[in-house]
Amino acid sequence: MRFLAYFGHLNIDVLISVDSIPREGSVNVKDLRPRFGGTAGNFAIVAQKFRIPFDLYSAVGMKTHREYLAMIESMGINTGHVEKFEDESGPICYIATDGKKQVSFMHQGAMEKWKPQLADEYEYVHFSTGPNYLDMAKSIRSKIIFDPSQEIHKYSKDELKKFHEISYMSIFNDHEYRVFREMTGLSSPKVTTIVTNGERGSSLFMDGKKYDFPAIPSSGDTVGAGDSFRAGLYLALYNRRSIEKGMIYGTIIAHHVIDDGIENFSLNMEDLERETENYRRMFTKRS
């Protein structure tokens, strides 16, 4: 049995800097910068640096993603389970920002044609962004991690409730968790649940208790921080450590990704363990 299947986006974000966001008409573009990311892509780049074994499941259009695939393959990331559509583009997100507000235009492209299938048996299967994965989740025996991210509205009330109940763990950010509770009517989670809340840190709901993990002050771009946090969680699970230890790993890794950027992330296992001990002494009584 393999360790982890990770479902999500290999997204190209095109960042467009403008002086102001117009209601209509046109404005001058000050800067145009593509960035390789997505829920699965960001996770994969960080997880690979810690040699966490995983299989990436996603779909891309080869009109746009050849360079992206070449980059992650050069890092040793296996793309054998990434479905490649030769005559398709995407997924691409165009993000225009004036520094205060932003507007996004999402082209799903290949993801809309993808019919995902699991190719092997895994201990963990992580379902993040993409199509509605509920039918697949109901048919497998793996430990399911439900992580709908910004696509939580893709699921109905009953689907959200069912996916959560059959999962080993659910992961939301603070906004998604509010949406989840409002849609399902659940006042508290039924299974182990992680809620991330940016600079306020994260919370673990487990066995009827809540454990809070403060964030480490950071300054930088937060894009990819949440996906990097998940790499820390799986690093702990792969090494048969506790979920609480994974929360600390994730907090520290996300801090470094925010400060340094994913492309410059260089934290090694020795330094991570040292920083984990420092974090435990400062913030927690249990890990």
UniProtKB/Swiss-Prot annotation:
The record marks R230 as: Transition state stabilizer. Keywords: ATP-binding, Cobalt, GTP-binding, Kinase, Magnesium, Nucleotide-binding, Transferase. The keyword DNA-binding does not apply. Its EC number is 2.7.1.20, 2.7.1.213, 2.7.1.73. The active site is at D227. SUPFAM superfamilies: Ribokinase-like (SSF53613). Optimum pH is 6.6. Significant activity is observed over the pH range of 6.4 to 7.8. Enzymatic activity decreases markedly at pH 8.0 and at pH 6.2 and below. Homodimer. Nucleoside kinase with broad substrate specificity. Catalyzes the phosphorylation of a variety of nucleosides to the corresponding nucleoside 5'-mono-phosphate in the presence of phosphate donors and divalent cations. Displays the most efficient activity with guanosine, followed by inosine, cytidine, and adenosine. Negligible enzymatic activity is detected with thymidine, uridine, and 2-deoxyadenosine. ATP is the most efficient phosphate donor, but can also use GTP and ITP. This is Nucleoside kinase.
